[in-house]
């Protein structure tokens, strides 16, 4: 609870009854959020494609293709947190007797249950901050995609050509299917019903009121469309250098358009405290015209140059020109040397630009270790240890002020074929990205509030950080006193600076034909030697090889690989295979208890399968993932999701699991 002076107390401590997920392990009534969150939502996908191809006279053809797909994801997330004023006549209104602060936290004194702030003299009711005892919210995301493609291709007067018309539409909706209340039922006019006990177990009447408050429905809809017209043609120019292969010129053009729209429904008015969405109806669009030309010139039998140039004109990001040069040299039959250099351009997506703003949890403590008010011995009635450690609130969504990403790319490699059926490629790559589009990490904002002061929105309020304000306006304008936990940090898309990375890609492929069948071995691996990244524009470039990336906490692995061994019987009726996915270890986000760097161990997963073709056109595959039931290595990283103790970006929390795949070809 929060008294009229903004001090925080836990009337239910140390019993912490009334919710099965409350624990006293940290010296207060803490909620185990991960235990009430579905880490692997149930997914379902149905898709189909129809294709018609007809040959036309003189080596031409027309093709029509239609694709339809429906996918859904259903799961549950942590419960609603409520923050309602209490009626002093409620039988559960605190009396002041026996009240203590949150564990070891020192609160302001004396306890003020008067309903009037002792500093300002303004009315300030006592607020009950509590968790839905039914624990989880249930939701569903539904996506329907349709695409139609019309293509003409063939040869005419020595020219190879293709022309395509494409139109696609993607419709999605987000809905709550359980655990979301109509707050007017629980707290008419913002005052908690006296039937509800926010500090302990519910009475039968209180539980019945909570159960009857839930409402289901679609709260947000989205629609994306895209159309494009593509024309491409190529023609041989002749063998001017007697290289044995004629030079070729290719050129083409493209015109496309896309739209984005996202809007909330009237149902969102009743559930905005759960979604963090204010009512919105946002949209955006763009048109693009592009033209390219490519010239492939063999200057001798062993040496080939390829030069291309592309110009794009965006209705919202202007004109850009990018070129690419490729060289291929084969001094020996068994050895090929290849390389390329290019520039690139990527405009922010319409979602990056126009996604609706919404409030949601931001990982990390409210103001982090960099805040002088959040140091031991510096706490006050407003900057308490509780409010400094509370999970903060972030404002998410699009940003129409984004700049486009640009890139420079270089690679140089060799292809070696020392014996028949064995191919080895080794390529060095170097990539430079500028104006990368991402989000500034919450940990960076909390850890250095002075540098990121423009990303912190404070307000004149005692709104508890762990409670999501119903609207952005309320998060920015609440009373009566100044506290850092009222407001939010800005987590909208931003240009976060530069990334420079280089390393090596290794590929080894080998096949063997034997009396018992054909064996194929394949290795695909990447070694990263440099990964420099800025966490904000103008910030220092940090070498993160073997560490967690700052922006998304995805490890920059020194080495990772996929190895596969497949076997096919001589009659092609049977098949089997094994695969290994390996990721090298890295430095964890937080040090150990002694302040030393903590390392996350390497991770290897072995998968296998057996397949059979019992009849023509039917293949049945039985597979096993994580054959050796390997547990993921422990990590203490705060990943911005609710996967606790393991890295959900690479690890499989299912451990050993089985699957079956049926494929029938008409």
Show which residues each predicted segment covers.
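Short loop/turn motifs that connect adjacent beta-strands in outer-membrane beta-barrel proteins
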Residues: 56-59, 155-160, 238-248, 299-303, ...
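Transmembrane beta-strands of outer-membrane beta-barrel proteins
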Residues: 62-64, 161-163, 229, 247-253, ...
């Amino acid at each position: 609870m929060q008294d009229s002076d903004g001090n925080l107390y836990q009337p239910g401590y140390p019993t912490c009854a009334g919710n099965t997920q409350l624990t006293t392990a940290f010296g207060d009534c803490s909620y185990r959020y991960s235990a009430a969150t579905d880490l692997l939502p149930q997914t379902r996908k149905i898709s189909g494609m129809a294709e018609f191809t007809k040959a036309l006279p003189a080596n031409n053809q027309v093709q029509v293709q239609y694709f339809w797909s429906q996918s859904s994801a259903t799961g549950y997330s942590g419960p609603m947190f409520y923050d309602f004023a209490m009626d002093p006549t409620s039988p559960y209104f605190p009396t002041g007797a026996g009240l203590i602060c949150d564990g070891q936290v020192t609160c302001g004194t004396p306890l003020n249950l008067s309903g009037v702030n002792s500093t300002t003299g303004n009315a300030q009711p006592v607020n009950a901050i509590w968790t839905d005892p039914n624990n989880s919210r249930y939701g569903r995301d539904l996506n329907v995609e349709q695409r139609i493609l019309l293509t003409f291709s063939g040869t005419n007067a020595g020219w190879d050509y293709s022309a395509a018309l494409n139109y696609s539409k993607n419709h999605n909706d987000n809905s709550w299917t359980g655990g979301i209340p109509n707050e007017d039922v629980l707290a008419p006019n913002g005052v908690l019903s006296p039937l509800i006990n926010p500090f302990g177990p519910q009475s039968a009447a209180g539980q019945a009121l909570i159960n009857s408050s839930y409402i289901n429905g679609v709260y947000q809809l989205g629609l994306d469309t895209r159309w494009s017209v593509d024309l491409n043609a190529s023609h041989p120019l002749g063998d001017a250098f007697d290289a044995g292969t004629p030079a070729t010129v290719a050129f083409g053009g493209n015109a496309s358009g896309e739209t984005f729209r996202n809007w909330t429904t009237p149902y969102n008015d009743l559930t905005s405290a759960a979604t963090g969405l204010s009512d919105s109806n946002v949209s955006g669009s763009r048109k693009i015209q592009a033209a390219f030309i490519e010239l492939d010139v063999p200057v001798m039998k062993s040496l080939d140059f390829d030069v291309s140039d592309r110009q794009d004109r965006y209705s919202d990001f202007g004109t850009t020109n990018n070129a690419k040069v490729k060289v291929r040299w084969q001094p020996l039959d068994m050895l090929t040397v290849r390389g390329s250099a290019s520039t690139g351009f990527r405009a922010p997506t319409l979602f990056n630009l126009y996604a609706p703003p919404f409030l949601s949890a931001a990982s990390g403590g409210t103001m982090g270790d960099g805040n002088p008010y959040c140091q031991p011995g510096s706490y006050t009635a407003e900057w308490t240890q509780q409010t400094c450690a509370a999970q903060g609130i972030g404002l998410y969504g699009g940003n129409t002020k984004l700049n486009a990403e640009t890139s420079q790319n270089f690679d140089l490699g060799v292809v070696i074929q020392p014996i028949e059926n064995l191919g080895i490629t080794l390529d060095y790559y170097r990539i430079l990205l500028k104006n990368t589009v991402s989000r500034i990490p919450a940990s960076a904002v909390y850890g250095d509030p002075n540098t990121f002061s423009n990303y912190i929105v404070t307000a004149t309020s005692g709104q508890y950080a762990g409670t999501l304000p119903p609207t952005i306006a309320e998060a920015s304008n609440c009373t009566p006193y100044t506290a850092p936990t009222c407001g939010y940090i800005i987590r909208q898309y931003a240009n976060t600076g530069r990334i420079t990375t280089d390393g090596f890609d290794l590929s080894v492929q080998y096949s063997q034909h034997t009396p018992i069948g054909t064996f194929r071995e394949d290795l695909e691996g990447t070694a990263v030697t440099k990964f420099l990244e800025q966490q904000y524009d103008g910030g220092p470039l940090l070498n993160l090889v073997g560490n967690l990336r700052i922006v998304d906490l995805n490890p920059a692995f020194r080495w990772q690989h996929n190895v596969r061994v497949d076997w096919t019987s001589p009659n092609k009726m049977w098949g089997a295979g094994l695969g290994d996915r390996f990721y090298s270890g890295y430095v964890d986000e937080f040090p150990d208890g002694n302040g030393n760097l903590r390392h996350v161990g390497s991770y290897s997963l072995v998968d296998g399968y057996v397949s059979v073709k019992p009849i023509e056109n039917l293949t049945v595959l039985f597979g096993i993932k994580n054959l050796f039931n390997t547990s993921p290595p422990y990590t203490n990283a705060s990943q911005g999701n609710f996967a606790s103790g393991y890295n959900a970006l690479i690890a499989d929390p299912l451990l050993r699991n089985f699957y079956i795949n049926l494929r029938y070809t008409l």
